[in-house]
Amino acid sequence: TTMSSIFSFNLQNGLLNWNENVDSTNTPIIDLNNIFLFSDNGFFINIDKKTGKMIWSVNVLKILKKKKQNTKVTGFIMGSGKIYATTLNGYLIQCSAVSGLVENVRKIGDLITAAPIISDGALYILTDKSRIFGFN
């Protein structure tokens, strides 16, 4: 396998600020100071946006039973200081955006390949069987 990287460029002159090797196919979430992403092996990672240094890394899949850990995060979204991640095998994992620690896990049931969305204060998940789950 090949390792992928995340890069930061100076938009004024096009020079590379930093790069960090992270094996991830998910699109990161970027806020004022942080870059949040999930590695392909289930680690929730927070990178300092200015320096590129890893602030923390938490294996969120280890909260699942051993036989359910062989999955991947298929998408995630941030809302109210929380990260909501969906897994291919049908779990919703809620993490703190401050510490990365898992705060809640919910089994949805169906395969999930799309990222969750937030609208009007509610979280929505679309499964591969075209079922929509909504949470307040």
Positions of the model-derived regions?
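Extracytoplasmic beta-rich repeat domains
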Residues: 1-3, 12-32, 57-79, 103-120
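C-terminal hydrophobic structural anchor segments
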Residues: 77-97
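WD40 beta-propeller blade core
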Residues: 7, 45, 93-94, 133
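Short loop/turn segments that connect beta-strands within beta-propeller blades
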Residues: 10-13, 48-51, 96-100, 136
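Structural signature of WD-repeat beta-propellers
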Residues: 1-3, 32, 39-40, 80, ...
